[in-house]
Amino acid sequence: MTPQDFDFLRQLLRQRSGLVLSAEKQYLAESRLLPVARKHGLGSLGELVERLKAATFTAPIGVEVVEAMTTNESFFFRDKIPFEHFRDTIMPALMAARAREKRIRIWCTACATGQEPYSLAMGLKTIGPSLAGWKVEIVATDISHEVLAKAKAGIYNQFEVQRGLPIQSLVKFFAQVGEAWQIAPEIRGMVQFRQLNLLNDFASLGTFDLVFCRNVLIYFDQETKVDVLNRLARQMPADGFLVLGAAETVVGLTEAFKPMPERRGLYVPNTPAVKPTPASNVLKFALKA
């Protein structure tokens, strides 16, 4: 692939998905896009670039290129700490604040193959009677149609269920299907999957009490990070929560959120109305059901 072709691809990916591809990642583009070129009967990435130049913005080949370059790695209860925050801080605070309306909305902004929202759903299931009469909605979005199809099916191979999933949860919430495992219908039914590009307007999704936006911002340039964070803030109430990845922060990007003291990766809207839940009032529930 020529430097000019690679520059074109970098610009296309940035415009359509926000993904910033550094110059040293040409090898990654070649390995992921050659199968796309072959699928369309093209003999080289140069031919793929020419096809992209001639295609309309919404042409399927452009969508396939973006999906091929999007990082889709995910696993159950990834990094553990965010799910500890969910258990020990976020849910107790939201259940106290929403005791009257008994409704909580959660958004996983880049759900990939579904392990993150399903991990949250399994965590909610373990609360049991404490959530009786509550409506807890989990909306999970991703830019890729392909990974969303896998997420909706909820079928994972042996390697995938061994990455982070406690054996107790595997036994309780999964059924073996051949050599794979399918998550139980009751868990799948707790998650709504939708296709969404975070660069596009997402105001129509409504307000969310909790937003998981992990390992997404690291692929964006600073301008896009600021834009996404500020728009997320407009989708959240004053007492909402934002969870970012371990390598991500709002510091130096926006004043719409502030870090929650002693809660790594957890942020709250920048308003005096938000206070940490006292430890004595924390509701405990075990993620390892």
Predicted regions located by residue number:
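Core SAM-dependent methyltransferase catalytic element
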Residues: 210, 253-289
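Conserved AdoMet
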Residues: 1-107
